[in-house]
């Protein structure tokens, strides 16, 4: 038998950003706790709105599963006398376990026979277990910035104001923060009232009658469709912005979308100047025409019904107008000062107390960008554009617009540089040097943006590690992981195969040139290189490469992301070929035996058997070709060439014993195997695949 179970935690308005994590936590914790309680159920769902967090368990068993438990008793010699009759020890053990002495059985433990009893433990009624389950579940939820209220010691997202707990039509009684659980929930703060539930199945329908759509998935889809319909009325559409849609969804309980107008005088502003206040500050959805350009409309969503919608629309329009008026003023004021004139002011802006000013950082970016441009083989005119980009990259931090809208850094710099007549490559580079800004963002497309972006991120990472700032667990306040992923991702696109080891060294030296004291390079280099290695692994795994393939490649080198990516892809492809198993076996056997080499010099002339001499001669022909192909990063062809050695290696193992008594011959054979490992290892350390 089973019944539906409902637990609702009603509270004051919870920040929208708390909602996704709360849902995940509540669902995971509830599943784990129900499993530990041996309570079966059909389905489990968590609902969330700003004012409630609800667990709904469908067809929860009315009773725990019965279990059988084996208990170990005294040894056989103590449990039975010489005649095989149970002793007092056996009788007492049986009584203590609640079984008949005849039901005891023997079983060996560490070679000694003991008596055992199999106990049948009946499950408890679910109704008795649920009060503690509710209390434990509520207490298990954590939030980024929880609150305390009243005289209570507990913390929660926001003060809890009511509790509902129903198992079928029965209230599950418990008390928490001075509140008693019951069957009464609350509807919309202004449109709904108190809602009395007789059973969990009524929950969604009863709340919707009180102007609350509790199912966040349905609420989100309702918003999506309303927005789409309103934008279509003016011949437009709204960009797919799941983050904004999710945030809006978690800000309200009963969505009603409305279409607002933007004063056309603001439409001459740069697009981002219009959309940023809309999206970031007001949570409005900008409307675009079929050509992709902004239309003078926006869609917003109110938390309520359609009552007085025109009044609400006018209020939203006024708020946006004030925002855009400020933005227009800042934009006009910023245009009065050429972007290059702002660069000296960066000397007065502190980047980090131990890493100097932003002005000093700009000088570091120029020097590091110049080195990267050299490594990439850029032409002199391209290098000049890179230097100009690095010089102006941070200048917009001084502007009014970026001060008020920090998310526009780089974007406004590009607009201002363009208005000053800077080359398009410089403008694009200023905008792109912050990319990728977030997971899944594009990499810079322009060479200026790419070079300065690599320099910018390397400077941030090396500087942070140099003053003891490293990501720990989920904490990464300087977004160093994202920046490292950006560096690695961009280097994987560069055919020049740049070295992280060299770039880290260059960045460190530039800090030293400015007399900025960092931890010794030899102290931080291992952590830095391992940090980048993990980012390389992550990116390639995201691209579908197996962990053992990456183990094989990264065991060989973790310095050059471009060649690592090429080598890993080649290994993954070669692994599928019919002859790869033989290749792998040959490599592993050579590698394992060659570890026994003493390291002493050996002479090919000491090789005696025709099979080993033939292998050595063939190796002399093939090894240079394999090295040449590997140096050119043509790993597939390198593998094809190296694979020619496999039949000869197999013949060698059939014909001779490697570990012979004669020292010079043994050394020569082990040396030969070492050379084979070097050539066959063109795809990585293949012992990682064995």
Give the predicted meaning of each segment.
Residues 1-690:
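Amphipathic alpha-helical "coupling" segments that flank catalytic cores
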């Amino acid at each position: 038998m089973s019944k539906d179970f409902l637990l609702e935690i009603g509270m004051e308005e919870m920040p929208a950003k708390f909602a996704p994590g709360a849902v995940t936590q509540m669902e995971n914790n509830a599943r784990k706790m129900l499993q530990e309680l041996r309570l079966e159920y059909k389905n489990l769902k968590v609902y969330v709105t700003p004012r409630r967090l609800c667990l709904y368990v469908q067809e929860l068993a009315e009773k725990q599963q019965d279990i059988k438990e084996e208990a170990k008793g005294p040894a056989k010699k103590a449990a039975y006398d010489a005649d095989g009759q149970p002793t007092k020890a056996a009788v007492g053990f049986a009584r203590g376990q609640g079984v008949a002495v005849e039901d005891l059985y023997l079983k060996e433990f560490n070679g000694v026979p003991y008596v055992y009893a199999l106990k049948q433990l009946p499950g408890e009624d679910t109704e008795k277990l649920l009060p503690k389950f509710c209390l434990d579940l509520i207490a298990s939820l954590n939030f980024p910035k929880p609150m305390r209220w009243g005289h209570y010691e507990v913390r929660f997202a926001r003060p809890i104001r009511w509790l509902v707990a129903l198992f079928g039509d029965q209230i599950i009684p418990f008390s928490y923060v001075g509140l008693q659980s019951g069957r009464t929930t609350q509807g919309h703060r202004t449109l709904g009232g108190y809602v009395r539930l007789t059973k969990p199945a009524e929950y969604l329908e009863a709340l919707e009658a009180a102007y609350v759509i509790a199912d966040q998935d349905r609420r989100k889809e309702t918003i999506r469709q309303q927005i789409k319909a309103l934008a279509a009325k003016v011949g437009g559409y709204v960009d797919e912005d799941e983050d904004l849609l999710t945030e809006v969804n978690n800000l309200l309980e009963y969505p009603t979308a409305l279409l607002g107008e933007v004063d056309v005088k603001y439409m001459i502003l740069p697009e981002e100047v219009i959309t940023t206040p809309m999206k970031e500050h007001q949570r409005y959805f900008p409307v675009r025409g079929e050509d992709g350009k902004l239309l003078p409309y926006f869609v917003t969503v109110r938390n309520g019904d359609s009552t007085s919608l025109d009044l609400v629309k006018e209020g939203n329009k006024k708020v946006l107008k004030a925002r855009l008026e400020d933005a227009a003023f800042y934009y006009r004021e910023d245009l009065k000062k050429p972007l290059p004139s702002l660069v000296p002011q960066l000397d007065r802006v502190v980047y980090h107390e131990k890493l100097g000013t932003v002005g000093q950082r700009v000088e570091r970016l120029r020097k590091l960008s110049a080195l990267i441009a050299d490594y990439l083989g850029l032409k002199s005119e391209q290098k000049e554009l890179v230097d100009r980009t690095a010089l102006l990259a941070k200048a917009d931090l001084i502007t009014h617009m970026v001060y008020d809208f920090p998310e526009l850094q780089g974007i406004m710099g590009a607009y201002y540089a363009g208005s000053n007549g800077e080359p398009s490559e410089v403008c694009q580079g200023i905008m792109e040097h912050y990319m990728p800004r977030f997971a899944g963002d594009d990499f810079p497309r322009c060479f200026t943006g790419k070079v300065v972006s690599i320099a910018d991120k390397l400077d941030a990472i090396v500087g942070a590690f140099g003053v003891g700032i490293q990501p720990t667990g989920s904490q990464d306040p300087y977004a160093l992981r994202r920046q490292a992923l950006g560096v690695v991702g961009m280097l994987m696109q560069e055919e020049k195969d740049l070295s992280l080891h060299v770039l880290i060294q260059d960045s460190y030296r530039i800090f030293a040139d400015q007399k900025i004291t960092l931890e010794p390079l030899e102290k931080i280099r291992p952590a830095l290189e391992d940090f980048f290695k993990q980012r390389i692994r992550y990116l390639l795994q995201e691209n579908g490469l197996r962990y053992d393939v990456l183990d094989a490649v990264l065991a060989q080198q973790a310095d050059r992301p471009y060649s690592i990516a090429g080598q890993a892809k080649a290994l993954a492809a070669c692994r599928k070929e019919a002859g790869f198993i033989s290749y792998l076996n040959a490599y592993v056997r050579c590698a394992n035996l060659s570890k026994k080499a003493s390291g002493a010099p050996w002479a090919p002339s000491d090789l005696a058997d025709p099979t080993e001499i033939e292998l050595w001669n063939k190796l002399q022909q093939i090894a240079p070709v394999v090295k040449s192909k590997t140096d050119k990063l043509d790993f597939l062809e390198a593998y094809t060439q190296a694979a020619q050695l496999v039949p000869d290696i197999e013949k060698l193992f059939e014909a001779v014993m490697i570990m012979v008594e004669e020292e010079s011959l043994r050394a020569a054979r082990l040396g030969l195997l070492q050379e084979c490992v070097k050539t066959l290892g063109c795809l990585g350390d293949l012992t990682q695949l064995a």
